[in-house]
Amino acid sequence: MTTRKYFGTDGIRGRVGQFPITPEFMLKLGWAAGMAFRKMGACRILVGKDTRISGYMFESALEAGLSAAGADVLLLGPMPTPAIAYLTRTFHAEAGIVISASHNPHYDNGIKFFSGQGTKLPDEIEMMIEELLDAPMTVAESENLGKVSRINDAAGRYIEFCKSSVPTSTDFAGLKVVIDCAHGATYKVAPNVFRELGAQVVVLSAQPDGLNINKNCGSTHMEALQAAVVAEHADMGIGFDGDGDRVLMVDHTGTIVDGDELLYIIARDLHERGRLQGGVVGTLMSNLGLELALAEQSIPFVRANVGDRYVIAELLERNWQIGGENSGHIVCFQHATTGDAIIASLQVILALRRSGISLAEARLKLRKCPQILINVRFAGSGVDPVSHPSVQQACARVTEQMAGRGRVLLRKSGTEPLVRVMVEGEDETQVRSYAEELAKLVAEVCA
């Protein structure tokens, strides 16, 4: 298998100003992508972004590179990542480019691509782009340069798409919901989707200034949303991340409902209505309780590697519809081609309205096993802590001691310099002790 030089598990991501997240690299990346897609014929490429300040700089650089390669460019402005996937497909473009670092702070940014079908870019095209990145840059003749235009009604198109996932006979009258937009890409569209469906909406963190994206808000910092739901006597809260591809929710008591629980609510509703195609795809990090609860409903469950691209690949291979991660990436293939936070939250609300129960009651139908996750910073000392013999021996010993009633998982993050240590089992005190023991050992090996 060819080793990627630039692309990670979810595109290219890093600190702004540090290679490869620089204007110079983005110019070359735009050109390389344009050349790769031009090999398939004339092409149009959509470009969208989240709200971080560096997005404007990188948008200009990509636009110039794409045009230099002879590719036409359609600029969407700040839009959720799944909206860019949807619009790439409906505009019959050859590709879509997202400028975003998702849930990361404002000082990070990144690039990911969608194919013309609104799916993650095939590996062979990524490799073609990588090869072109190392080639000398050329510029098309003036008459062949790409044209650049802006799509002014992109938000309205996506709002209507989201609403189309809700039956026309259904509205959200009587529902009070608090939405936290993380000062990110959903800040315009999400409140309007829920308002137009009839809900009473209280909006948090929808004043982006380029620097406040994900800052103490959104799906990675749920405290303000939890407090607001209780203070407003709302039925629920919905927390999006900065680019709108992951969602967590809060029930009326202020309790967080994570991705595993949301996935179970959607899957159970589909199963009870005879609409579930196949089973459910989770990840190595999915709670054991999800697997057991689905088994009680005779719903098949498989685990993919961590990352929504692996969940999507597993769904495609099995021709299943529903998958996701406990972090809140939820894929509903019956409606969208990628993880879509707004679509997922709408499907949860529809499931609750059909069943006549609250989010708090639905959450309790999934009995989660205690799961402790500790992130250990990995500075890249040259030693792989995950495969280190002493770490492997300790993991084997802990697994044996749990006697089939728990799991141990160590993995390196695909987007950050972290080793994630996860231990799961029936006894929380025991699980925490094991996790802390393993995390300490990993830290020592990393040092």
From Swiss-Prot:
Cofactor note: Binds 1 Mg(2+) ion per subunit.
Keyword line: Isomerase, Magnesium, Metal-binding, Phosphoprotein
Catalyses which reaction(s): alpha-D-glucosamine 1-phosphate = D-glucosamine 6-phosphate
Posttranslational mods: Activated by phosphorylation.
Listed cofactors: Mg(2+)
A Gene Ontology BP annotation from the UniProt entry: UDP-N-acetylglucosamine biosynthetic process
EC nos: 5.4.2.10
Active site: S102
Keyword Isomerase: yes
Keyword hit for Isomerase: yes
GO MF term list: magnesium ion binding; phosphoglucosamine mutase activity; phosphomannomutase activity
Cross-referenced CDD domains: GlmM (cd05802)
PTM annotation (Phosphoserine): residues: S102
Stored InterPro entries: A-D-PHexomutase_a/b/a-I, A-D-PHexomutase_a/b/a-I/II/III, A-D-PHexomutase_a/b/a-II, A-D-PHexomutase_a/b/a-III, A-D-PHexomutase_C, A-D-PHexomutase_C_sf, A-D-PHexomutase_CS, Alpha-D-phosphohexomutase_SF
Any Gene Ontology CC annotation: cytosol
Binding site for Mg(2+): S102, D241, D243, D245
Superkingdom to which the source organism belongs: Bacteria
Top EC class for this record: isomerase
Similarity annotation: Belongs to the phosphohexose mutase family.
Task of the protein: Catalyzes the conversion of glucosamine-6-phosphate to glucosamine-1-phosphate.
Classification via PANTHER family: PHOSPHOGLUCOMUTASE (ALPHA-D-GLUCOSE-1,6-BISPHOSPHATE-DEPENDENT), PHOSPHOHEXOSE MUTASE
Official protein name in the record: Phosphoglucosamine mutase
Gene name of the encoded protein: glmM
